């Protein structure tokens, strides 16, 4: 049983963060924000996949001018990612953005910080302080001998102090590093010092497999420790894939569930069907289904139903014959490998209608 650390509650749009709220799934568009249509299309795709908050880069005024069109009717709250230029933060808030990712210590003098904080207060816009181990201040790097967890936390607290000095507490913090161990240590240290909500992730995690593994290890340990209020799985891949990995991490730890869990055997010499292809096609066909249930795809008619008896519905294939089962009990036999997928999907549709009471 995971006992989550209680943090301050804040809202990004209508999505509750921290407090008693669940861990929220977040991602970031990789489109050019100046292209409002493609950016909005990706936001819609992310939302359909289960993303609850989306961040967009705002590198210049042209991107800021596209925000109203992107924001209008968005299915999820949006966070504007701002670097250095306080005017972009002001423009983003005027456009109706739901939150900012900006480091107040990097935007210039006190008057500029005052302007951003004043506007954020007026519009109830939270600010995420985002510390990255790869871009720490040179003085901190010299003090700690590198991008250590202590250096990352001190950097975050310096930014926090600028906001608290102005009585601004609508704040979330992230401490990201490409090192799993440094990231874990940094978040644990931060949690000892402040109770602001934490946005957790492993930055520059890598391509699909490497990034999914690093993120799963790092985030899994943080969640087990009770840390983390929002999450992003950073992948060098389609951002929609980040959302799927995030939900699987949450499901694996019993924290949240969304959509079917698909279990399948790793194949062996007894496998007599194209199981890898079948399992992938079942997963593809169920993408977008939000109902929570377990589907098994097994490669052996002898052991399959018994090994997957906990599955709500499953299929096991043999040479020219497949069996469909529910909770380990055979309900149908299917002849011909080419019929396995279509007949199984029909049974899943029937199962879902029954589950939904239709």
UniProtKB/Swiss-Prot annotation:
Catalytic activity: (2E)-4-hydroxy-3-methylbut-2-enyl diphosphate + oxidized [flavodoxin] + H2O + 2 H(+) = 2-C-methyl-D-erythritol 2,4-cyclic diphosphate + reduced [flavodoxin]
Cofactor: [4Fe-4S] cluster
Keyword Iron: yes
Cofactor note as given: Binds 1 [4Fe-4S] cluster.
One GO biological process term: terpenoid biosynthetic process
Superkingdom as given in the UniProt entry: Bacteria
Gene3D superfamilies with a match to the protein in the record: Dihydropteroate synthase-like, Sulfite Reductase Hemoprotein, domain 1
Associated pathway: Isoprenoid biosynthesis; isopentenyl diphosphate biosynthesis via DXP pathway; isopentenyl diphosphate from 1-deoxy-D-xylulose 5-phosphate: step 5/6
EC number: 1.17.7.3
Binding site residues for [4Fe-4S] cluster: 265, 268, 300, 307
Keywords, in A-Z order: 4Fe-4S, Iron, Iron-sulfur, Isoprene biosynthesis, Metal-binding, Oxidoreductase
One GO MF term attached to the UniProt entry: 4-hydroxy-3-methylbut-2-enyl-diphosphate synthase activity (flavodoxin)
Family stated for the protein in its record: Belongs to the IspG family.
Known function: Converts 2C-methyl-D-erythritol 2,4-cyclodiphosphate (ME-2,4cPP) into 1-hydroxy-2-methyl-2-(E)-butenyl 4-diphosphate.
Protein name, UniProt field: 4-hydroxy-3-methylbut-2-en-1-yl diphosphate synthase (flavodoxin)
């Amino acid at each position: 049983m995971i006992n989550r650390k209680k943090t301050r509650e804040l809202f990004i749009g209508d999505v509750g963060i921290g407090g008693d709220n669940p861990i929220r799934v977040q991602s970031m568009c990789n489109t050019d924000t100046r292209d409002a249509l493609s950016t909005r299309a990706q936001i819609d795709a992310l939302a359909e996949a289960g993303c609850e908050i989306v961040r967009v880069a705002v590198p210049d005024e042209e991107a800021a001018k596209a925000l109203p069109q992107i924001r209008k009717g968005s299915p999820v709250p949006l966070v504007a990612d701002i670097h250095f230029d306080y005017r972009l933060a002001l423009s983003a808030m005027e456009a109706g953005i739901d939150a900012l990712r900006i480091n107040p210590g990097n935007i210039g003098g006190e008057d500029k910080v005052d302007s951003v904080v004043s506007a954020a207060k007026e519009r109830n816009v939270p600010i995420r302080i985002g510390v990255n181990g790869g871009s720490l201040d040179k003085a901190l790097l010299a003090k700690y001998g590198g991008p250590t967890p202590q250096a990352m936390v001190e950097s975050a607290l310096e930014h926090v102090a600028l906001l608290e000095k102005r009585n601004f507490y609508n704040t979330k913090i992230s401490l990201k590093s490409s090192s799993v161990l440094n990231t874990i240590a940094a978040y644990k240290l931060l949690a000892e010092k402040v109770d602001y909500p934490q946005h957790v992730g492993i930055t520059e995690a890598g391509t699909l497999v490497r990034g999914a593994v690093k993120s799963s290890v790092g985030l899994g340990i943080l969640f087990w420790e009770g840390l983390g209020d929002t999450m992003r799985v950073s992948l060098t891949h389609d951002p929609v894939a980040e959302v799927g990995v995030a939900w699987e991490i949450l499901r694996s730890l019993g924290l949240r569930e969304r959509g079917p869990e698909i279990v399948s055997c790793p194949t062996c010499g007894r496998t007599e069907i194209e199981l890898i292809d079948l399992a992938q096609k079942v997963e593809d066909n169920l993408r977008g289904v939000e109902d929570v249930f377990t589907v098994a795809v097994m490669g052996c008619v002898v052991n399959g139903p018994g090994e997957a008896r906990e599955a709500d519905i499953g299929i096991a294939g043999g040479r020219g014959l497949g069996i469909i089962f529910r909770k380990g009990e055979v309900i149908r036999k299917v002849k011909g490998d080419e019929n396995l997928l279509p007949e199984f999907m029909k049974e899943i549709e029937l199962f879902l209608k029954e589950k939904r009471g239709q």
